[in-house]
């Protein structure tokens, strides 16, 4: 008996017919046979077949040959099984796949879903990470919550709140990162310490009473607490894109001393033409890896702090371990003392481990102009226990050229 023609007014009818034909044959079916049995043009049939393949409902073991159900990917990554009684969402299918097979790369997940490239599944994976369903270590994806928690969140359709943005309300912010998957966003801040054992000291300006204030970051290991078990710091992954960083310490055991109040600088907008700041002229982005060398036991090995900087404006920043920066501000129009050259100087990093007393404590004027493509008073690198600490001084002067004072020190 001849097959009844398929109503092409709806795609569902054609999908059901294709699945029925493939299921009845029980094996691979040539595209020519499908065209005859479904009685539709080959072009229309192929469009539906490839859509079903992307949904992992059919597979193509050979060219122009189709069979029911998904197939294992060619690189050994297992396929996500199809549940014919229900149609789970892509989120749920990814959760099931990762729970059954463990952490996998994005490409393996994409192929298990019937896709061909990692780019097709990456938006979904990052969306699931923002919902705290998945975690990513830079190589592989894995489940963040337990299976039941992941199912509840995926079925509820409720999106978890994004991590709160921390806005500065105090002279110095101290942020302690806890947990393996904690996420911190910082906006509109300066005088920030990112790392362990850092110290920022803000000295009073000339004529202002009162002692200087120190804001050390709490140490995770205290030798006096003998009854406390040693705990190693967790690895830190820091990404900065189109940001303005002033008086920022990235690394461990850095010291920064500020004499007088920080000058008011014009606000920068990164929406139109962000300044490209880099350690090299060829690459607009830079990455740094830093190892801790702090005292105390480290049961899990040395801690790595990975920092990636792209299109940022950095002023008075230290990147590395054991750096020391002292900043003296000079106001516009100030007369240079005898013996000073007309251009700002960078001190020899090996001549002294103590900060030179400030020659002036006047504030930097609010209309001082800053370059948008330079690193200013920035220390890069690590300081070994045997070497002296570097001292960098910044002098604000009258014009733009003399204000472009960049200090780079690597020991």
Swiss-Prot record:
Gene3D superfamilies: Winged helix-like DNA-binding domain superfamily/Winged helix DNA-binding domain. Residues 8-70, 84-148 form the Z-binding domain. It holds the Pfam family RHIM. GO terms for cellular component: cytoplasm; cytosol; nucleus. Residues 60-86, 263-303, 332-411 are annotated as: Disordered. A motif (RIP homotypic interaction motif (RHIM) 1) lies at residues 188-205. Ubiquitinated; polyubiquitinated following influenza A virus (IAV) infection. GO terms for molecular function: DNA binding; double-stranded RNA adenosine deaminase activity; double-stranded RNA binding; left-handed Z-DNA binding. Expressed in lung, spleen and liver. Lower levels were seen in heart, kidney and testis. Expression is greatly up-regulated in tumor stromal cells and activated macrophages. It is found in: Cytoplasm; Nucleus. InterPro entries: RHIM, WH-like_DNA-bd_sf, WH_DNA-bd_sf, Z_dom, ZBP1. It comes from the Eukaryota. A motif (RIP homotypic interaction motif (RHIM) 2) lies at residues 237-261. Induction: Expression is activated by IRF1. Up-regulated following interferon treatment. By lipopolysaccharides (LPS). There is a cross-link at residues 17, 43 (Glycyl lysine isopeptide (Lys-Gly) (interchain with G-Cter in ubiquitin)). ZBP1-dependent necroptosis is normally inhibited by RIPK1: RIPK1 inhibits the ZBP1-induced activation of RIPK3 via FADD-mediated recruitment of CASP8, which cleaves RIPK1 and limits TNF-induced necroptosis. GO terms for biological process: activation of innate immune response; apoptotic process; defense response to fungus; defense response to virus; innate immune response; positive regulation of apoptotic process; positive regulation of inflammatory response; positive regulation of necroptotic process. Disruption phenotype: Mice are resistant to necroptosis, characterized by a decrease in epithelial cell death and an increase in virus replication. At a modestly lethal dose of influenza A virus (IAV), mice display significantly increased rates of mortality, probably caused by a failure to eliminate infected cells and limit virus spread in pulmonary tissue. Perinatal lethality observed in Ripk1 knockout mice is rescued in knockout mice lacking both Ripk1 and Zbp1. Skin inflammation observed in Ripk1(mRHIM) mutant mice is abrogated in Ripk1(mRHIM) mutant mice that also lack Zbp1. Keywords: Antiviral defense, Apoptosis, Cytoplasm, DNA-binding, Host-virus interaction, Immunity, Innate immunity, Isopeptide bond, Necrosis, Nucleus, Repeat, RNA-binding, Ubl conjugation. Key innate sensor that recognizes and binds Z-RNA structures, which are produced by a number of viruses, such as herpesvirus, orthomyxovirus or flavivirus, and triggers different forms of cell death. ZBP1 acts as an essential mediator of pyroptosis, necroptosis and apoptosis (PANoptosis), an integral part of host defense against pathogens, by activating RIPK3, caspase-8 (CASP8), and the NLRP3 inflammasome. The Z-binding domains recognize and bind left-handed double-stranded Z-RNA structures, but not A-RNA, the right-handed double-stranded RNAs that are structurally very different from Z-RNAs. The second Z-binding domain (also named Zalpha2) acts as a molecular switch regulating pyroptosis, necroptosis and apoptosis (PANoptosis). The second Z-binding domain is essential for sensing influenza A virus (IAV) Z-RNAs. Homodimer. Interacts (via RIP homotypic interaction motif) with RIPK3; leading to RIPK3 activation and necroptosis; interaction is enhanced by CASP6. Interacts (via RIP homotypic interaction motif) with RIPK1. Component of the AIM2 PANoptosome complex, a multiprotein complex that drives inflammatory cell death (PANoptosis). This is Z-DNA-binding protein 1. The lineage of its organism: Eukaryota, Metazoa, Chordata, Craniata, Vertebrata.
